[in-house]
């Protein structure tokens, strides 16, 4: 009876192999179910065919087909073919199975997710190649079906899933570093990055690998997953192979050094002087051999199991000792260099991990692996205690920007389910917060001084004092009202409609996002952009969001003439600071302060009498301006804002050009709306400036065969001519996001706003 069952299974296996290898292609999925009585390969996978007996397959298939349009999953028939290597295509084993995949999953991730669902590892899934076969057609690679990076499984297989076979070719390659660089793809790069990010953060990885930090984040988060060039994948594959080989070599050197130290101890034990020898007289080679032979041959209680039990010549022993010392020296130098590169992550401050050296090993392991769910509250408490800005804390704690820290605090994801990149950042913040309070304060002070020195050395010297119309009394008064303003917040009408009011106010007053964000909430344009993008429901439990919206509500509650006067005042201050002559950049700080005092006195003397609606003295003008942080807390942000004031909205700085060129190198010249949104918030530039830059680069590539060389100088997109702009991407981006405020559909309004800003700059 068992023999008959085996014969039946062998017959089914041969029929399945014939169907799979038939060039005409397999029949429809429903017909295949009716012929075999069970999904192909079920018997070989341990599933019995008896479970399907008595079930009308036509009826179940019909129900499955009718219910799939309402569900979120699609069945895909997969045939996995194992090969010994990529050159010899001798099929080793076949594995056929149905896999349920999500409809909203990206189509270019179908192979990887199918293999993961079948129980294969990430490394195996990364090395696989897939072909898709529809009906009796010839199988083709998935990349031939569509090149749209955002195409989903439902878009491609919704109507043909019952006649589709996904053929996956899996090559036997034990490790990613053994994979040839020519076979590296987007999937292998992403899995390799995920593996590397378990031991280091993105910034330290970007310093070593050929990918930039923004590109690493995009690949890991699948943002630009399909836009990585094949040449970049191969370059990363070559680097990864060299990196893993070097790392394995370091591990071997470490183990060899430990072994050599133990071996040296045992050799010294065997080289005890024989009677007649003195300590001053070194033993002769014959005596060394004579003295060491009995001790090595006789089993020692503490002899290392890896040591050989046969006699070793003195020359070989000396060579091994010299080699072990050399390896130890090289390893010590490498560790020293690695420690120096690690310190660069923390802006030349000692790494936070060093504080746990005196702790037991169990505590070190727990602090390195577990992140408390209270980390977000700890960060907020630290910001309040030290009176520092998010920009300063983000730089010294985990070497990131203020925007990323604000996004992390806004979402508050559970560390247990967080992504690997977020977990690295949370662990870095937690390690930093476990430093002594005095040491943290010293690091904050060093960072403030460093940012001040860098600002005075790099660009136009920022005005450290506030404009004369904003005395310190206004700040203290408004801060007091903010701290004691809980009843005021409760009486305010703060709901989801405040986002529409912000947009209407910017349209009415014709002010930019940067200007409104500064006067209403003392924030940057990127912060306001993210605020209006997500439009979270205001709630007092989300304290940070509630306080920021309360400041905006207080500002919007002011009379319209007062708001317009504040806009005008801030705009004049921006133009006044931006029109300073370039020769003042290298003037000593004492002369700059004297000039500032003279300018303030002149402005106070020449200032006309205030208009009738504002006869009150200046201390009562507190509600007009939003509360600010203390001057010490926001020194780094004020420096950044002052540097941004000096640059018109159409100018791209050298640093921003470097980021844009890195983006072009990694992604290309055709950014989507999300990429434009990200670059605009990251570089604090309007969208029309970003778009015109890419249009000009595409024009030069099309008509001149190469990208425009800016030679390390600032770029002003207002100087571009209309014929130098290739506008083949704007319409598609506008149609895709026609209903959002921050879509490229507003490019015309932004360009008009940008031209008015430029004209105002020229007039001033």
Curated annotation (Swiss-Prot):
Motif stretch (Nuclear matrix targeting sequence (NMTS)): 224-278
Coiled-coil ranges (or none): none
Entry keyword set: Acetylation, Chromatin regulator, Chromosomal rearrangement, DNA-binding, Homeobox, Isopeptide bond, Nucleus, Phosphoprotein, Repeat, Repressor, Transcription, Transcription regulation, Ubl conjugation
Domain of life: Eukaryota
Linked residues for Glycyl lysine isopeptide (Lys-Gly) (interchain with G-Cter in SUMO): 745
Comp. bias (Low complexity): 593-606
Spans annotated as Disordered: 1-56, 266-307, 450-474, 591-650
Record-listed N6-acetyllysine modification sites: 136
Regions recorded as binding DNA: 361-448, 484-571, 646-705
Disruption phenotype: Mice are small in size, have disproportionately small thymi and spleens, and die at 3 weeks of age. Multiple defects in T-cell development are observed, including interrupted thymocytes differentiation and abnormal T-cell transcriptome. RNAi-mediated knockdown in neural stem/progenitor cells in the adult subventricular zone impairs early neuronal differentiation.
Post-translational modification: Sumoylated. Sumoylation promotes cleavage by caspases.
Motif window: Nuclear localization signal: 20-40
Family: Belongs to the CUT homeobox family.
Job description of the protein: Required for the switching of fetal globin species, and beta- and gamma-globin genes regulation during erythroid differentiation. Plays a role in chromatin organization and nuclear architecture during apoptosis. Crucial silencing factor contributing to the initiation of X inactivation mediated by Xist RNA that occurs during embryogenesis and in lymphoma. Binds to DNA at special AT-rich sequences, the consensus SATB1-binding sequence (CSBS), at nuclear matrix- or scaffold-associated regions. Thought to recognize the sugar-phosphate structure of double-stranded DNA.
Protein name: DNA-binding protein SATB1
Gene (name only): Satb1
């Amino acid at each position: 009876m068992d023999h008959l069952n085996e014969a039946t299974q062998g017959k089914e296996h041969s029929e399945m192999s014939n169907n799979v290898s038939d060039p005409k292609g397999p029949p429809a999925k429903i017909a295949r179910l009716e012929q075999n009585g069970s999904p192909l390969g079920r018997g070989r996978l341990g599933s019995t065919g008896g479970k399907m007996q008595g079930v009308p397959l036509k009826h179940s298939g019909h129900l499955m087909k009718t219910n799939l349009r309402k569900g979120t999953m699609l069945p895909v028939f997969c045939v996995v073919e194992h090969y010994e290597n990529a050159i010899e295509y001798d099929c080793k084993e076949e594995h056929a199975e149905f896999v349920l995949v999500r409809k909203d999953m990206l189509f270019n991730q179908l192979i990887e997710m199918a293999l993961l669902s079948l129980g294969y590892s990430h490394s195996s899934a990364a090395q696989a190649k897939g072909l898709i076969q529809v009906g009796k057609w010839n199988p083709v690679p998935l990349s031939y079906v569509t090149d749209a990076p955002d195409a989903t499984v439902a878009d491609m297989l919704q109507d043909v899933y019952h006649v589709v076979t996904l053929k996956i070719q899996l090559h036997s390659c034990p490790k990613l570093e053994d994979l040839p660089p020519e076979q590296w793809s987007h999937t292998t790069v992403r899995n390799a990055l995920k593996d590397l990010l378990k031991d280091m953060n993105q910034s330290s990885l970007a310093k070593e690998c050929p990918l930039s930090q923004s590109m690493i984040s995009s690949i890991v988060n699948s943002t630009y997953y399909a836009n990585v060039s094949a040449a970049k994948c191969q370059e990363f594959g070559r680097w990864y192979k060299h990196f893993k080989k070097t790392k394995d070599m370091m591990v071997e050197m470490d183990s060899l050094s430990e072994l050599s130290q133990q071996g040296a101890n045992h050799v010294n034990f065997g080289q005890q002087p024989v009677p007649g020898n003195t300590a001053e007289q070194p033993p002769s080679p014959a005596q060394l051999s004579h003295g060491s032979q009995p001790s090595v041959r006789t089993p020692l209680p503490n002899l290392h199991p890896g040591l050989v039990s046969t006699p070793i010549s003195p020359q070989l022993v000396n060579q091994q000792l010299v080699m072990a010392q050399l390896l130890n020296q090289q390893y010590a130098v490498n560790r020293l260099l690695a420690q120096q590169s690690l310190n660069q992550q923390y802006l030349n401050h000692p790494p936070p991990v060093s504080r746990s050296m005196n702790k037991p090993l169990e505590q070190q392991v727990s602090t390195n692996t577990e992140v408390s769910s209270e980390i977000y509250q700890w960060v907020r408490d630290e910001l309040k205690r030290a009176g520092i800005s998010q920009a300063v804390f983000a730089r010294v704690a985990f070497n990131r920007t203020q925007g990323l820290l604000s996004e992390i605090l806004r979402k508050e994801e559970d560390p247990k389910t967080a992504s690997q990149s977020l977990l690295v950042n949370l662990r870095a913040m937690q390690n930093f917060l476990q430093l002594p309070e005095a040491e943290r304060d010293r690091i904050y002070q060093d960072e403030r001084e460093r940012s001040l020195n860098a600002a005075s050395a790099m660009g136009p010297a920022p005005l450290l004092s506030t404009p004369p119309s904003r005395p310190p009394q206004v700040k203290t008064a408004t801060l007091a009202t903010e701290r004691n303003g809980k009843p005021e917040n409760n009486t305010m009408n703060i709901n989801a409609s405040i986002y529409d009011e912000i947009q209407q106010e910017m349209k009415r007053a014709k002010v930019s996002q940067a200007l409104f964000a500064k006067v209403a909430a003392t924030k940057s344009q990127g912060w306001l952009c993210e605020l209006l993008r997500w439009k979270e429901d205001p709630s007092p439990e989300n304290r940070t969001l509630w306080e920021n919206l309360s400041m905006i509500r207080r500002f919007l509650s002011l009379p319209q003439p007062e708001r317009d006067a504040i806009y005008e005042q801030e705009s004049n201050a921006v133009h006044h600071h931006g029109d300073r002559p370039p020769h003042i950049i290298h003037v000593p700080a004492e002369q700059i302060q004297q000039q500032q005092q003279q300018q303030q006195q002149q402005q106070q003397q020449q200032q006309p009498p205030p208009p009738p609606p504002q006869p009150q003295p200046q201390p009562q003008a507190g509600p007009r301006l939003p509360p600010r942080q203390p001057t010490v807390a926001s020194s780094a942000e004020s420096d950044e804002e002052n540097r941004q004031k000096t640059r018109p909205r159409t100018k791209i700085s050298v640093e921003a050009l470097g980021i844009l060129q890195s983006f072009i190198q990694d992604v290309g010249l055709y950014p989507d709306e999300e990429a434009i949104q990200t670059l605009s918030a990251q570089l604090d530039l309007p969208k029309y400036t970003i778009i015109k830059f890419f249009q000009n680069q595409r024009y030069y590539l099309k008509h001149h065969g190469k990208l425009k060389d800016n030679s390390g100088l600032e770029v002003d997109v207002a100087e571009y001519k209309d014929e130098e702009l290739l506008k083949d991407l704007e319409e598609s981006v506008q149609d895709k996001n026609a209903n959002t405020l921050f879509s490229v559909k507003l490019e015309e309004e932004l360009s008009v706003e940008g031209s008015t800003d430029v004209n105002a700059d020229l007039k001033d």
